[in-house]
Amino acid sequence: MSMTDPISDMLTRVRNGQNAGKVEVSMPSSKLKVSIARVLKEEGYIEDCKVIADAKPTLVIRLKYYGGKPVIEDIHRASRPGLRMYKSRDKLPRIRGGLGIAIVSTSRGVMTDKTARSIGEGGEVLCYVA
């Protein structure tokens, strides 16, 4: 049976891994998942991410903790298969007054809401991270 929402699966694996105190989580890889993981790494929410190229590529994410607590307090899906959420640059959400990020898929690639706003791009809001 195929997975209907691989991005939700990725976010759930990260959330469950941090709640369980895991060092790293692994999942099937895709270009979009790697792009999301790259943004999370650039913003300091995860330690590292790498793709293990086998017959089925696997994405491995090293989780980050500060003082024994997960760095990611909240991570959840915004746009989903049943209800896509597209926003123009003016309508991109500010998460926790700018302390969190929204990950946006634009025509120029996957980036944070702040980056998309600064280059004047809108797009599909994939998820929120705080």
From Swiss-Prot:
PROSITE patterns: RIBOSOMAL_S8 (PS00053). The keyword RNA-binding applies. GO terms for cellular component: ribonucleoprotein complex; ribosome. Keywords: Ribonucleoprotein, Ribosomal protein, RNA-binding, rRNA-binding. One of its GO terms (molecular function) is rRNA binding. GO terms for biological process: translation. One of the primary rRNA binding proteins, it binds directly to 16S rRNA central domain where it helps coordinate assembly of the platform of the 30S subunit. Part of the 30S ribosomal subunit. Contacts proteins S5 and S12. HAMAP family: Ribosomal_uS8_B. NCBIfam families: PRK00136.1. Belongs to the universal ribosomal protein uS8 family. This is Small ribosomal subunit protein uS8. It comes from Nitrosococcus oceani (strain ATCC 19707 / BCRC 17464 / JCM 30415 / NCIMB 11848 / C-107). The gene is rpsH.
